[in-house]
Amino acid sequence: MIGKGIRRLLIQAKQYSADSRILLVSPIHLGEQVWKDEFDPEFSPESVEVSRKLTDVYKKIADEFGVEFLAASSVADSSEADQEHMNPEGHAALAGAIEEKIYQMAC
C-alpha cells in the first residue's frame, strides 16, 4: 500500500516538473519494542518487520522511476525513548547524509 502512494507522488512530481531531480528517502526502522504498551501499542510485532522491508520497496520504486535514493535506516535508528522516532543525533546524521547526497546530485 505504501508503495502505491509513493508511486502516485512521484508521478505527480514528474508531471509537475519533469526535469526536477528527486531524492526518495526511505524511513528508519521501527524499534523492536515499539508495539509494547509503554511505547506505541498501535503498532504490532508485524509492524517492525514491515518497517524493515520498506527500504527495499522504496529502492525498487526509486530505480523504477529513475530517481536518487537514500535509506534513512543506513544512517539513523529509532530512539530508545519511543522506539519510533530519531533522537537528535539521528536527525543530525540523516541531515548530513541528505546534504551529502544532494551535493552529489548537483555535481
Task: Walk through the language-model features, giving the residues of each.
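Alpha-helical cap/lid subdomain in secreted, periplasmic
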Residues: 1-107
